[in-house]
UniProtKB/Swiss-Prot annotation:
Homodimer. Catalyzes the ADP transfer from ATP to D-glycero-beta-D-manno-heptose 1-phosphate, yielding ADP-D-glycero-beta-D-manno-heptose. It comes from Yersinia pestis. ATP binds at N195, L196, S197, E198. Residues 344-476 are annotated as: Cytidylyltransferase. It comes from the Bacteria. One of its GO terms (molecular function) is heptose-1-phosphate adenylyltransferase activity. This is Bifunctional protein HldE. CDD domains: RfaE_like (cd01172). The lineage of its organism: Bacteria, Pseudomonadati, Pseudomonadota, Gammaproteobacteria, Enterobacterales. The keyword Kinase applies. One of its GO terms (biological process) is lipopolysaccharide core region biosynthetic process. Keywords: ATP-binding, Carbohydrate metabolism, Kinase, Lipopolysaccharide biosynthesis, Multifunctional enzyme, Nucleotide-binding, Nucleotidyltransferase, Transferase. It holds the Pfam family PfkB.
Length: 476
C-alpha cells in the first residue's frame, strides 16, 4: 500500500477518557533500611508524564494536529502538573474538576533501571455526573474530524453510549480503545482497537487466522461497528470491515525496547490521519508504522511527522535517517556494540551545496557512522538573523538524511550542540572551517571521555551566503 502523510495541521481530534499522571522517582540504592528489610532509595530525579487518555492526546499533538482533551481530575497538584505538561505540547485541556476525588496518579520508584514499587493514588470516578463531559463534547464536535474515547475503566467513560450518539448525529467518526469484555457498551462506534488478549476475552481463544477473522467479523456485525482493528503485537494488526476482505498489516518494528503506550500511539495516529482526510485503510497503515517507531523507544513515547515519514519510506526499519535524541542514543549504543566508530558534526545546512556534500563525505571517511546535528529554525534565526533559515528544519533534515554519507540526523534547539554532544559522546567530533579544536562546542566533553576532535577544511568559494547573494543579484 502506497500512503503519503496527510497535512496533520488541518486535523482536529477530541480525546475523551481517563486521564492520569505518571510520576517517576529515580535514585540509587546503597543500603537496607534499619526499620524494615527494604532498600533505601536516595531520590535524585523526579519525572512526570501525562498518561492514559492524556498520552493519546500527546500523540495527536506531536503530529501537528489540533488535540483537545476532556477528562476528570481532582483539584490538586497532579491536575496542575497535567495541565502544565500538556500545554507544553499544545494539547488543549478542558478538564472537569471533581473536588471530592484526587487526580489519578501512578507513582513508580526506580533504581538502576529496576522498578521497586508502584503506588496508585486513585478512587475512581464512578458516580460522577457525566453531563459536563457531554456538554464539552457537544461544543467541540463542529471543530473536529474524529472523536477518540480512551477507556481505562476509571469512570470517565461510564456513560459511553450518549457520547457515541452525539458524535454519530454530527457525522464524526468515533474511535474507541476498549477496556474489559463488555463490548455492548461500545455499540455503534466507528472503530474499536482492542489488542489480541482484549479481543479474545470477548470472542474466545482463536486457534488460527481464519477463526480470528470470522469471530471478528461477527463481532463487527453484532455490535453494529463500522470496523474493528485488532492489534497483535509482533504479528502486526488486522483490520476487519463487513463486505471487505480483511487487511493484515505486518509489524514494522525492527527492535522492541518497550511497548508502553503503543496502543495510545496507534489510536492517536489513526484518529489524526482520519481527521486529516485519509481513508481508514491508509490511516491504519500509518498507525502501524507509528507503532513500529514507538516500541523502539524507552518509556511512553510519541512519534513525529518526520519519524513517521521515515517509517513509511522504510528508513526507520534500517535504524538510520532522521531521529530524535532518544532514538539516536539507542542507535549509537547498538553501533558501539558492533565495534563501529561514531563521528559527529553539526551545522545549519540551510541550502545544501557541493561544499557541504564534500565535507560530509570526508567526515564519514573518518569512521563507520556519521551523525549530523542540525540547528532548529529558532536557533538559526538567533545566529543568522530573521530572514534565515531559507529552508525549514524538517526539509533540511530530510535532505541531509538522503545523503549516502550521513547515517543519522538529529535536531537541537540551543545555539550550540554542546549538551547534545555531551549526551552522545562521539568517538570523533568534527567541525568544518578555520576553528581551533579547543574552540569547538563539545570538545572538552569528548576529550574527557577519551574521544578525538578534528577540524576539516571547507571547499573554497562555496557557501550558503554566497548562493543567497547570487540569487539576489539574479545570477542563480
Amino acid at each position: 500500500m502506497k500512503v503519503t502523510l496527510p497535512d496533520f495541521r488541518r486535523a482536529g481530534v477530541l480525546v475523551v477518557g481517563d486521564v492520569m499522571l505518571d510520576r517517576y522517582w529515580y535514585g540509587p540504592t546503597c543500603r537496607i533500611s534499619p526499620e524494615a528489610p527494604v532498600p533505601v532509595v536516595k531520590v535524585d530525579t523526579i519525572e512526570e508524564r501525562p498518561g492514559g487518555a492524556a498520552n493519546v492526546a500527546m500523540n495527536i499533538a506531536s503530529l501537528g494536529a489540533v488535540a483537545r482533551l476532556v477528562g476528570l481530575t481532582g483539584i490538586d497538584d497532579a491536575a496542575r502538573a497535567l495541565i502544565c505538561k500538556l500545554s507544553e505540547v499544545r494539547v488543549r485541556c478542558d478538564f472537569v474538576s471533581v473536588p471530592t476525588h484526587p487526580t489519578i496518579t501512578k507513582l513508580r520508584v526506580l533504581s538502576r533501571n529496576q522498578q521497586l514499587i508502584r503506588l496508585d493514588f486513585e478512587e475512581g470516578f464512578d458516580g460522577v455526573d457525566p453531563t459536563p463531559i457531554f456538554e464539552r463534547i457537544q461544543l467541540a464536535l463542529p471543530q473536529i474530524g474524529a472523536l477518540v474515547l480512551s477507556d481505562y475503566a476509571k469512570g470517565a467513560l461510564n456513560s459511553v453510549q450518549p457520547m457515541i450518539q452525539l458524535a454519530r448525529k454530527a457525522n464524526v467518526p468515533v474511535l474507541i480503545d476498549p477496556k474489559g469484555s463488555d463490548f455492548e457498551r461500545y455499540r455503534g462506534a466507528t472503530l474499536l482497537t482492542p489488542n489480541l488478549s482484549e479481543f479474545e476475552a470477548v470472542v474466545g481463544r482463536c486457534k488460527n487466522e481464519e477463526e480470528l477473522v470470522n469471530r471478528g467479523m461477527q463481532l463487527v456485525a453484532d455490535f453494529e461497528l463500522s470496523a474493528l482493528l485488532v492489534t497483535r503485537s509482533e504479528q502486526g494488526m488486522t483490520l476487519l470491515q463487513l463486505g471487505k476482505p480483511p487487511l493484515h498489516l505486518p509489524t514494522q518494528a525492527k527492535e522492541v525496547f518497550d511497548v508502553t503506550g503503543a496502543g495510545d500511539t496507534v489510536i492517536g495516529v489513526l484518529a489524526a490521519a482520519l481527521a486529516a482526510g485519509n481513508s481508514l485503510e491508509e490511516s491504519c497503515f500509518l498507525a502501524n508504522a507509528a507503532a513500529g517507531v514507538v516500541v523502539g523507544k524507552l518509556g511512553t513515547s510519541t512519534v513525529s511527522p518526520i519519524e513517521l515519514e521515515n517509517a513509511i519510506r522504510g528508513r526507520a526499519e534500517t535504524g538510520f535517517g532522521v531521529m530524535d535524541e532518544q532514538q539516536l542514543k539507542i542507535a549509537v549504543a547498538q553501533a558501539r556494540q558492533r565495534g563501529e566508530k561514531v563521528v559527529m558534526t553539526n551545522g545549519i545546512f540551510d541550502i545544501l551545496h557541493a561544499g557541504h556534500v564534500s565535507y560530509l563525505a570526508n567526515a564519514r571517511k573518518l569512521g563507520d557512522r556519521l551523525i549530523v546535528a542540525v540547528n532548529s529554525d529558532a536557533s538559526t534565526k538567533r545566529l543568522k538573523g530573521e530572514k534565515r533559515p531559507v529552508n525549514p528544519l524538517e526539509q533540511r533534515m530530510v535532505v541531509l538524511g538522503a545523503l549516502e554519507a550521513v547515517d543519522w540526523v538529529v535536531p537541537f534547539e540551543e545555539d550550540t550542540p554542546q549538551r547534545l554532544i555531551a549526551d552522545i559522546l562521539p568517538d570523533l567530533l568534527v567541525k568544518g572551517g578555520d576553528y581551533k579544536p579547543h574552540e569547538i562546542a563539545g570538545s572538552e566533553e569528548v576529550w574527557a571521555a577519551g574521544g578525538e576532535v578534528k577540524v576539516l577544511n571547507f571547499e573554497d568559494g562555496v557557501s550558503t551566503t554566497n548562493i543567497i547573494q547570487s540569487i539576489k543579484n539574479g545570477r542563480g
